């Protein structure tokens, strides 16, 4: 923290902590700064394709019992996104009249005005989705960046003295 753009120590500089151990397991998530440094330092991405990223938005809903179909999984791609933007949706029917409703937008879109949140809201206006959620109640929500590059984008999964437990570049 506190490192300036040119690499010098700024007024808020704090030395990072030392991670020491026989083995260090890194679980930093998407595009983590430590994982990025490890990939570069140990050339872990040398034999892999560049990673791709998306933004996933998910809501947990409680729906009317007569609309619930335990175990049903639905995936879609495309709409409401335009043909030059990748992404898709998911609906997972859970126990207790609950469903996850989510939408992923690939983060390589060209339109600077595109709103992944707005596209998710549009997705929920689809007649089938709107009917499913009508009379229901949103219980929780969240969003996170996800890696989408596939197996060919996974870097080498070990480095001297450690291994990732959840990492992407």
Residue ranges and their predicted role:
Residues 1-128:
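Predominantly flavin-linked oxidoreductase catalytic cores and closely associated redox partners
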Residues 26, 164-165:
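General beta-strand structural signal in soluble alpha/beta enzymes
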Residues 36, 63, 134-135, 148, ...:
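Generic structural "secondary-structure junction" signal
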Residues 77, 91-92, 142-149:
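Short amphipathic beta-strand and strand-loop transition segments with alternating hydrophobic
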Residues 131-142:
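Flexible, glycine/charged-enriched surface loops at secondary-structure junctions
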Residues 144-164:
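FAD-binding beta-loop-beta segment adjacent to the flavin cofactor pocket
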Residues 168-169:
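Conserved small/polar residues in nucleotide/adenosyl-binding loops
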